[in-house]
C-alpha cells in the first residue's frame, strides 16, 4: 500500500476557485440557507440585491451606498495617493466587492490624438490639388487660380458687382468674405458670356503653399471670411488683408475680365502631412514646384484609458503598496508580491465569468481586439467583372457646334428654323473614364490597414521631409510611408496568409482595435477631457471581502504616468508627445449588505469565529517570471533549485517584447517609452508562434513525462519546419503532440474526434478559438530553372496606373506585369507549400496534474518518481525563433495563491497568505 505522502493531492486540484459551500464551515452554510428566503448570500457572498423586509428601524436604516472622502491625499509628479478611514458601524457588514474609487480629473491626450481616419478638411480634393495661389518668379507674381463667381461688372475700387438694390444702384462684393469659395455656377451647362465678369479668391505668395486636401484656415469674421487682420495705419483699426487684382484676356488687353481677391490667411493642416515635396531652396514657401506637393491624412491614433483601467492602480510590494489595516491592530491585509500579476488575473477572471466581447462603459470594460481580416489576409481577389465608368455631368463632353440645314433640290441650304450655330452635338459614344472601384478599395484597405503597420525597417522617409530622430514619437511614425507594392492586391493572391513581417507586430496596436476605439470615444473626440470615472478594486485578497464592524485605514496609489494608464493605437510615447493627466478628487463609494440588524449581528458573530474565516484564491494562482531573451537568441535556459512540487499545477508561457513590458516594481518606469497594448497586463499575447520546442527535466534521474507520447521524453516539440514523418497537424506546422497537450490542458479533451470544447470553456483567451493554421504556395526556386529573383524596385504590376515605390502620383506606362509568377493555370510554375500558424491571446500550457505525473517511469509502488522523492530541481530550455529586438520569456508557474482573512475583534484584520511551491514569491529562491 502506498504511503500517505505518496497519495495524489486531490485537494489541490480546484483550479478555478471553489464553490462557497466547499470552503465555508457547516455552521455558516446552514446560516446562509436559513436566511436564504429574504437574503441570498450566494457563492462567495456575492449577491447584495435583496433588501430586508423587517427589523430595520427608520433611524438606523441602511443606505445602500455611502461616499467616503479621503482623510489624506498626496499628489506627486508620478502618483496620487489617497487614504480613507472606513468606519463600519454596529450591525453592519461592508461589502468590499461593491466598493469603487470615484475619480474626477482632467486629461490632455496630447497633439498626437487623432480619433478618425482620413481628414476633416477638403477630404474630396485630389491629394495633389493646390489651393488657388500666387508665387514670385524673378520678382514677378504668377497666379494659378479659379474664378467661379460670375458678375455683371468690375469696378476698380469695389471689385465685382453681385447685383443691384431697390433703387437700381450696384451692389459690390464685400471683400472680407465675398466672393465666397462655395458659391459659383449652379448649372452644368452655364457658360461665361462675353460681357460677363468673373471673380474668385486667391492666396497671396506670402501664405505658405499647401495641398487643398487637409488645408484649413480659421475664420476671422462671422461671415466666414478668413483673411488675416492687419492694423490700419490711419486709425489703428483692424482690417482684412485683402487686395483686388484685375486680369484681362489677350483678346481685350485693356478691359478687366476677372478680379481675384488676394489675401493672406492663417493656413494650417491639422490632420494631414506631406508625403511628396519637391526639392526647393530652404525657406521657400511658395513656388511653381510647390504646386505639386502631395498630402496624406495623419494616421489615426485613438487614446483612452486601458481596459478595466489597467495600470491606473498601483499593485506592488516595493514600498508603494496599498493598505487595508484595522486601526486597532495596524496589521496590513494587503501583501502583494512582485511576481503576482493582479491585472492579468482580473482579465482572465472576467473572461471566465462572461462574454468579453460585450462592452460596459462604467468600468471601462472594452477588451482589446483586432480585425481578423487585418491579421490574416484572405486575399480572394476582387469581383470586378463589370467595368465601372464615370461620366460628364451633362452626359456628354466635348461637342461640335453645328448649324441647321435643309435640302434644296440637289444641294443644301441653311434652315431658318434653327438658330445659327445653335446645335451642340457630340460625335460617337458618350465620353467616359473607367475606374476599377473594387480593386482600388481593396488596395486602399491593404495599404491603410497593413502596409502602414509594417515594421519601421520596411518603410521610407519621403524625400525633402525631415522627421524627428526619436522613433517613438507620433511625428516620426506618422511621417514614414510604406511602399504600396510591398503588399498589393496581387501579393499572396488566392491565399489565406499573414504577411510574414507582420507576424511579430502587435496586431492590437491598430486603429481597428474596436475596444480601444470604444474607450477612446467614451471620453469624447477632443484633446482635452474633464473625466469622471469609476475604478473597481482588483486585488484578490480584498476585492470580495466582507468587512465587519470596526474602524479601518484604506489607502491606495494611483499612477499618473500617461504611458501606463492610457493606451494609444500607435503605441507612441505619450510623455514626449504631450499627454498629461491631473486628478482633482478621488472618493470611495461603498455598499453595506442590506441586512436586518439582528441578521447582520448574527453573521458578524459567526465570521468572528476563526473556523469561518474568509478564504480567497487569486484567479491566476501563479508565480510569474520574466526571463530576458537577447536579440536574435534562439535558446533560453531556466533553472529552479530543488523543492517539493506538491500542489504544482503546471506551466503557462508566452513571449513578450521588452519594449512593451513595463517594470511593475516602480511607480514610474523611465524606460517605458510606449503606450500600446501591454500583453503582460492585458492578455494581448501575439508571439506564441515563435516557440519551437521546450524541454523539461526534473533532475537527471526523472523521466517526465514518459515515453508513451508521440515524441521523446522530457521534450515538447511545438512546431516542425521539416515534417518528414508527418507529425504536423491541421494543415500547418504545429505538431500533433502539442495540439493534443493544448486540448488536454485547456479543455480536458484527449479524444480528437468530432468534438469541440463547450462554449463556456471556449472564450476569448481560449486556445481553440485563437488557433489559426494557414498555408500557401510559393515558387520553387530550385526546380524552376527559369526563376529570376526580381527585387521590389524592379517589379512592375499596374505600371503607369500607380505611383513608383511610394503612395505618390501615378507614373509610368501601361505594360505587361513581370511579377508575380503564376501558380495556377496551364503555365503554373513549380511550387513549394509553406505552412505556419498564429495563436494570439492564449498562453501555451503544459499541465502537471496527478494524471500527467503518472506519465513517467513508475516505481514498484506504481507511482511516478516525482512522488517518491520529496524535492527535485527543475531545468527547462525553450527554443524560440530569433527576433531582431530584445524580448522576454513570460512563464507562469501555476501554484496555489490563497489568502485567509481573520477578523477576531473590532478594528482587527489579519491575513495569512499561502503559496506553494513558491512560498517566497520568487521562483529563483
Curated annotation (Swiss-Prot):
Residue numbers bearing the Phosphotyrosine modification: 913
Entry's induction text: Expressed in the late phase of the viral replicative cycle.
Keywords of this entry: Acetylation, Capsid protein, Cytoplasmic inwards viral transport, Host nucleus, Host-virus interaction, Late protein, Microtubular inwards viral transport, Phosphoprotein, T=25 icosahedral capsid protein, Virion, Virus entry into host cell
An annotated GO BP: microtubule-dependent intracellular transport of viral material towards nucleus
GO cellular component, one term: host cell nucleus
Compartment(s) of residence: Virion; Host nucleus
GO MF annotation, one: structural molecule activity
Lineage: superkingdom: Viruses
Leader sequence residues: none
Residues that bear N-acetylalanine: 2
Ribonucleoprotein is among the record's keywords: no
Sites annotated Involved in interaction with pre-protein VI: 750
InterPro entries: Adenovirus_Pll_hexon_C (IPR016108), Adenovirus_Pll_hexon_N (IPR016107), Adenovirus_Pll_hexon_sub2 (IPR044942), Adenovirus_Pll_hexon_sub3 (IPR016110), ADV_hexon (IPR037542), VP_dsDNA_II (IPR016112)
Keyword Phosphoprotein: yes
Primary localisation category: virion
Quaternary assembly: Homotrimer. Interacts with the capsid vertex protein; this interaction binds the peripentonal hexons to the neighboring penton base. Interacts with the hexon-linking protein; this interaction tethers the hexons surrounding the penton to those situated in the central plate of the facet. Interacts with the hexon-interlacing protein; this interaction lashes the hexons together. Interacts with host dyneins DYNC1LI1 and DYNC1I2; this interaction might be involved in intracellular microtubule-dependent transport of incoming viral capsid.
Note: All late proteins expressed from the major late promoter are produced by alternative splicing and alternative polyadenylation of the same gene giving rise to non-overlapping ORFs. A leader sequence is present in the N-terminus of all these mRNAs and is recognized by the viral shutoff protein to provide expression although conventional translation via ribosome scanning from the cap has been shut off in the host cell.
Membership in a protein family: Belongs to the adenoviridae hexon protein family.
Function noted in UniProt: Major capsid protein that self-associates to form 240 hexon trimers, each in the shape of a hexagon, building most of the pseudo T=25 capsid. Assembled into trimeric units with the help of the chaperone shutoff protein. Transported by pre-protein VI to the nucleus where it associates with other structural proteins to form an empty capsid. Might be involved, through its interaction with host dyneins, in the intracellular microtubule-dependent transport of incoming viral capsid to the nucleus.
Annotated protein name in UniProt: Hexon protein
Organism of this sequence: Human adenovirus F serotype 41 (HAdV-41)
Amino acid at each position: 500500500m502506498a504511503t500517505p505522502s505518496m497519495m495524489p493531492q486531490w485537494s489541490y486540484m480546484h483550479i478555478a476557485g471553489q464553490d462557497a459551500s466547499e470552503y465555508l464551515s457547516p455552521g455558516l452554510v446552514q446560516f446562509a440557507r436559513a436566511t436564504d428566503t429574504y437574503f441570498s448570500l450566494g457563492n462567495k457572498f456575492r449577491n447584495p440585491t435583496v433588501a430586508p423586509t423587517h427589523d430595520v428601524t427608520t433611524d438606523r436604516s441602511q443606505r445602500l451606498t455611502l461616499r467616503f472622502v479621503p482623510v489624506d491625499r498626496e499628489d506627486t509628479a508620478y502618483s496620487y495617493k489617497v487614504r480613507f478611514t472606513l468606519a463600519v458601524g454596529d450591525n453592519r457588514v461592508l461589502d468590499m466587492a461593491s466598493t469603487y474609487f470615484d475619480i474626477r480629473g482632467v486629461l490632455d491626450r496630447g497633439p498626437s490624438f487623432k480619433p478618425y481616419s482620413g481628414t476633416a478638411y477638403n477630404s474630396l480634393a485630389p491629394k495633389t490639388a493646390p489651393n488657388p495661389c500666387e508665387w514670385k518668379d524673378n520678382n514677378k507674381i504668377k497666379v494659378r487660380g479659379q474664378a467661379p463667381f460670375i458678375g455683371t461688372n468690375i469696378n476698380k475700387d469695389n471689385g465685382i458687382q453681385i447685383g443691384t438694390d431697390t433703387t437700381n444702384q450696384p451692389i459690390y462684393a464685400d471683400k472680407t468674405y465675398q466672393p465666397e469659395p462655395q458659391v459659383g455656377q449652379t448649372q452644368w451647362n452655364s457658360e461665361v458670356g462675353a460681357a460677363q465678369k468673373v471673380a474668385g479668391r486667391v492666396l497671396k505668395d506670402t501664405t505658405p503653399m499647401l495641398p487643398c486636401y487637409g488645408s484649413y484656415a480659421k475664420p476671422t469674421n462671422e461671415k466666414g471670411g478668413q483673411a488675416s487682420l492687419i492694423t490700419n495705419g490711419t486709425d489703428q483699426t483692424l482690417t482684412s488683408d485683402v487686395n483686388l487684382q484685375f486680369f484681362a484676356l489677350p483678346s481685350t488687353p485693356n478691359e478687366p475680365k476677372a478680379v481675384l481677391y488676394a489675401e493672406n490667411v492663417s493656413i494650417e493642416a491639422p490632420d494631414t502631412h506631406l508625403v511628396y515635396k519637391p526639392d526647393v531652396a530652404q525657406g521657400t514657401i511658395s513656388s511653381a514646384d510647390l504646386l505639386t506637393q502631395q498630402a496624406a491624412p495623419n494616421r489615426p491614433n485613438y487614446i483612452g484609458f486601458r481596459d478595466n483601467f489597467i495600470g491606473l492602480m498601483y499593485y506592488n510590494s516595493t514600498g508603494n503598496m496599498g493598505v487595508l489595516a484595522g486601526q486597532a491592530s495596524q496589521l496590513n491585509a494587503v501583501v502583494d508580491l512582485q511576481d503576482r500579476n493582479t491585472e492579468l488575473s482580473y482579465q482572465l477572471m472576467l473572461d471566465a465569468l462572461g462574454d468579453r466581447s460585450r462592452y460596459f462603459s462604467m468600468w471601462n470594460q472594452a477588451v482589446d481586439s483586432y480585425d481578423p481580416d487585418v491579421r490574416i489576409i484572405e486575399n480572394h481577389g476582387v469581383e470586378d467583372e463589370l467595368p465601372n465608368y464615370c461620366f460628364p455631368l451633362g452626359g456628354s463632353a466635348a461637342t461640335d457646334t453645328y448649324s441647321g440645314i435643309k435640302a434644296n433640290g440637289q444641294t443644301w441650304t441653311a434652315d431658318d428654323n434653327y438658330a445659327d450655330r445653335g446645335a451642340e452635338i457630340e460625335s460617337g459614344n458618350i465620353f467616359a473614364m473607367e475606374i476599377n472601384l473594387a480593386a482600388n478599395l481593396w488596395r486602399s484597405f491593404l495599404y491603410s490597414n497593413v502596409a502602414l503597420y509594417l515594421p519601421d525597417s520596411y518603410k521610407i522617409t519621403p524625400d525633402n521631409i525631415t522627421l524627428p530622430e526619436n522613433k517613438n514619437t507620433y511625428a516620426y511614425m506618422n511621417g514614414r510611408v510604406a511602399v504600396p507594392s510591398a503588399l498589393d492586391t496581387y501579393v499572396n493572391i488566392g491565399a489565406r496568409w499573414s504577411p510574414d513581417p507582420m507576424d511579430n507586430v502587435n496586431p492590437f496596436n491598430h486603429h481597428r482595435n474596436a475596444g480601444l476605439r470604444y474607450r477612446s470615444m467614451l471620453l469624447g473626440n477632443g484633446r482635452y477631457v474633464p473625466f469622471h470615472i469609476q475604478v473597481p478594486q482588483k486585488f484578490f485578497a480584498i476585492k470580495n471581502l466582507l468587512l465587519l464592524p470596526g474602524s479601518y485605514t484604506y489607502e491606495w496609489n494611483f499612477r499618473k504616468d500617461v504611458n501606463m494608464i492610457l493606451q494609444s493605437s500607435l503605441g507612441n510615447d505619450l510623455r514626449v508627445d504631450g499627454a498629461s493627466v491631473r486628478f482633482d478628487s478621488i472618493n470611495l463609494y461603498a455598499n453595506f449588505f442590506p441586512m436586518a440588524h439582528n441578521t447582520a449581528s448574527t453573521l458578524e458573530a459567526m465570521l468572528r469565529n476563526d473556523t469561518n474565516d474568509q478564504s480567497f484564491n487569486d484567479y491566476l494562482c501563479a508565480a510569474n517570471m520574466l526571463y530576458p531573451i537577447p536579440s536574435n537568441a534562439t535558446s533560453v535556459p531556466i533553472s529552479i533549485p530543488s523543492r517539493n512540487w506538491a500542489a504544482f499545477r503546471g506551466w503557462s508561457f508566452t513571449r513578450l517584447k521588452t519594449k512593451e513590458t513595463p517594470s511593475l516594481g516602480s511607480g514610474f518606469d523611465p524606460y517605458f517609452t510606449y503606450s500600446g497594448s501591454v500583453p503582460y497586463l492585458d492578455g494581448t499575447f501575439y508571439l506564441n508562434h515563435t516557440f519551437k520546442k521546450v524541454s523539461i527535466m526534473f533532475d537527471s534521474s526523472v523521466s517526465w513525462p514518459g515515453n508513451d507520447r508521440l515524441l521523446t521524453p522530457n521534450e515538447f516539440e511545438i512546431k516542425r519546419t521539416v515534417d518528414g514523418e508527418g507529425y504536423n497537424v491541421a494543415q500547418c506546422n504545429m505538431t500533433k503532440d502539442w495540439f493534443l497537450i493544448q486540448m488536454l490542458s485547456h479543455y480536458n479533451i484527449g479524444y480528437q474526434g468530432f468534438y469541440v470544447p463547450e462554449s463556456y470553456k471556449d472564450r476569448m483567451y481560449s486556445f481553440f478559438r485563437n488557433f489559426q493554421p494557414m498555408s500557401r504556395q510559393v515558387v520553387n526556386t530550385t526546380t524552376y530553372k527559369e526563376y529570376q529573383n526580381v527585387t521590389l524596385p524592379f517589379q512592375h504590376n499596374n505600371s503607369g496606373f500607380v505611383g513608383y515605390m511610394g503612395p505618390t502620383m501615378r507614373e509610368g506606362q501601361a505594360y505587361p506585369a513581370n511579377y508575380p509568377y503564376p501558380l495556377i493555370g496551364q503555365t503554373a510554375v513549380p511550387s513549394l507549400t509553406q505552412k505556419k500558424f498564429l495563436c494570439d491571446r492564449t498562453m501555451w500550457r503544459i499541465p502537471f496534474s496527478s494524471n500527467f505525473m503518472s506519465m513517467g517511469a513508475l516505481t514498484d509502488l506504481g507511482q511516478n518518481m516525482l512522488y517518491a522523492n520529496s524535492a527535485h530541481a527543475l531545468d527547462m530550455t525553450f527554443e524560440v525563433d530569433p527576433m531582431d529586438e530584445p524580448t522576454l520569456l513570460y512563464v507562469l508557474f501555476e501554484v496555489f495563491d490563497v489568502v485567509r482573512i481573520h477578523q477576531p475583534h473590532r478594528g482587527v484584520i489579519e491575513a495569512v497568505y499561502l503559496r506553494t511551491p513558491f512560498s517566497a514569491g520568487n521562483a529563483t529562491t
